[in-house]
Regions:
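A charged, aromatic-enriched C-terminal amphipathic alpha-helix characteristic of glycosyltransferases
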Residues: 111-139
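Short glycine/serine/threonine/alanine-rich loop segments
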Residues: 17, 61, 128
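Catalytic binding pocket for nucleotide-activated donors in carbohydrate/polymer assembly enzymes
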Residues: 32-118
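Nucleotide-activated donor-binding/catalytic signature segment of Leloir-type glycosyltransferases, i.e.
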Residues: 2-30
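Conserved small/polar residues in nucleotide/adenosyl-binding loops
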Residues: 164-169
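C-terminal alpha-helical cap of glycosyltransferases
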Residues: 130-156
Length: 169
């Protein structure tokens, strides 16, 4: 949305050295930005999966996301009463809610650095690996097929399966 882009550029010009906005994508710059930033704003209107918020969390950059698709599935909103969470979120696609989420994140950053650091640790410790995904898949599979007993041992070494299909009849 052009209005948001212009707004971000305005604040970049108003606060040089403190705030920066890059609308284009540059892979080399993106890694440096993830590593240097404290917060990562991802206000997607639609996002089937989203990797950027996962990358941000791995770097210790807390995501601020709109609750849609994979963003809602991967970012746990910060709960100031329990300390749980991995980032910040907002529900509706509008500037007021987005601004409120950014304000909540900034307030925590400036007013409670211990809670902020704990939230960063929680975000960085999230497991989005294939091992976790495969284990969830197996849980579902064995739940749907109770007649099949799930093996107790888990293999820590990689397993390679080769499937061969032949066109020959």
């Amino acid at each position: 949305d052009r209005d948001y882009e212009d707004g971000l550029r305005y604040f970049q010009d108003k606060y040089p050295g403190t705030m920066a906005a890059r609308i284009e994508f540059d892979p080399a710059l993106s890694q440096r930005m993830y590593a240097a930033a404290d917060m990562f704003l991802m206000p997607s209107k639609f996002e089937p999966c989203g990797l950027s918020q996962i990358i941000a969390m791995r770097y210790g950059t807390l995501p601020i996301v709109r609750e849609t698709g994979g963003l809602k599935d991967t970012v746990i909103p910060y709960n100031e009463f329990t300390g749980e969470g991995t980032g910040f979120s907002f529900s509706n696609f509008n500037g007021d809610e987005m601004g409120d989420a950014v304000f909540r994140a900034a307030r925590l950053f400036w007013d409670n650095r211990d809670a902020w650091n704990q939230l960063v640790t929680q975000a960085m410790s999230q497991d989005f690996s294939w091992t976790r995904s495969a284990d969830k898949y197996l849980d579902l599979y064995f739940f749907m097929h109770p007649e099949i007993e799930r093996p107790a041992a888990v293999v820590d070494e990689p397993v390679v399966c080769l499937l061969y299909t032949s066109d020959a009849a």
